[in-house]
């Protein structure tokens, strides 16, 4: 896809701060530090539109980015390893659930899992939750460049089995730009 414009629009700490639903939205979800922000930057061919960090839990709000004035990319806070108080973690969970459950313009959820590990219980729980609410979901295995060539298919098969997928997850590496087009082709159902 040709990107003509990509801009940060708004951060939301509560549902009443979400933009008025008007154009399709694609949400990016996954555990803390799995590469959500990196994937968004890669898809948009930008280095710093979405802030990335090696520190888990950096994204603490729901961030909306308008793409080509046609749709939003929505960067959700990560779950799992963030070193935050449990009350903050529960607040994030309620915020994410409210967004995923109620957002009428949500067209797809990109669930990003770390290709180096089997999916976590939280990855499985989110996938089950999305299936229950009949939300379209696209599974992307991140950090594929961190695996040896011989490990890639084994890890992808494990992710497919653990998440009960019909098809193999798409691969992403911030170092290899060739895989972006395949992800783009699957973003808008």
Listing of model-derived features with the role each one plays in the protein:
Residues 65, 142, 183:
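Residue-level signal for inorganic ion chemistry
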Residues 58, 71, 78-81, 116-118, ...:
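Conserved nucleotide-binding/hydrolysis micro-motifs of P-loop NTPases
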Residues 43-47, 100, 163, 187:
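Hydrophobic aliphatic residues
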């Amino acid at each position: 896809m040709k990107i003509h414009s990509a801009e940060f629009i708004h951060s939301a700490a509560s549902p009443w701060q979400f933009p008025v639903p008007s154009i399709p939205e694609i949400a990016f979800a996954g555990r803390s530090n799995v590469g959500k922000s990196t994937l968004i930057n890669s898809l948009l061919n930008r280095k710093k539109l979405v802030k990335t960090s090696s520190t888990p839990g950096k994204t603490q709000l729901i961030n909306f980015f308008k793409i080509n004035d046609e749709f939003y990319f929505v960067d959700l806070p990560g779950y799992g390893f963030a070193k935050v108080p449990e009350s903050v973690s529960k607040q994030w969970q309620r915020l994410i659930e409210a967004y995923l459950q109620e957002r009428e313009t949500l067209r797809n959820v990109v669930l990003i899992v770390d290709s180096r590990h089997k999916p976590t219980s939280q990855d499985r729980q989110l996938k089950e939750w999305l299936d229950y609410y009949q939300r379209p979901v696209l599974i992307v295995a991140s950090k594929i460049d961190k695996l040896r060539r011989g490990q890639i298919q084994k890890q992808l098969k494990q992710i497919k089995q653990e998440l009960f997928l019909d098809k193999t997850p798409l691969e992403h590496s911030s170092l290899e730009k060739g895989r972006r087009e395949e992800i783009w082709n699957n973003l808008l159902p």
